[in-house]
Amino acid sequence: MKRTFQPSNLKRKRTHGFRARMKTLSGRKVIRNRRAKGRAKLAA
């Protein structure tokens, strides 16, 4: 059976990367919340 997680760095960056997050309002909220929490990594 094929597993659901088929890693691809390109897909990873395009969907969860910093620039992808900055494109949408909700994505910017994610970055803002992660900054407020003090995360070392803001995006993938």
Swiss-Prot record:
This is Large ribosomal subunit protein bL34. One of its GO terms (biological process) is translation. Transmembrane segments: none annotated. Signal peptide: none annotated. InterPro entries: Ribosomal_bL34, Ribosomal_bL34_CS. It comes from Francisella tularensis subsp. holarctica (strain LVS). Coiled coil: none annotated. GO terms for molecular function: structural constituent of ribosome. Belongs to the bacterial ribosomal protein bL34 family. One of its GO terms (cellular component) is ribosome. PANTHER family: LARGE RIBOSOMAL SUBUNIT PROTEIN BL34M (PTHR14503:SF4), MITOCHONDRIAL RIBOSOMAL PROTEIN 34 FAMILY MEMBER (PTHR14503). PROSITE patterns: RIBOSOMAL_L34 (PS00784). It comes from the Bacteria. Gene3D superfamilies: 1.10.287.3980. Keywords: Ribonucleoprotein, Ribosomal protein.
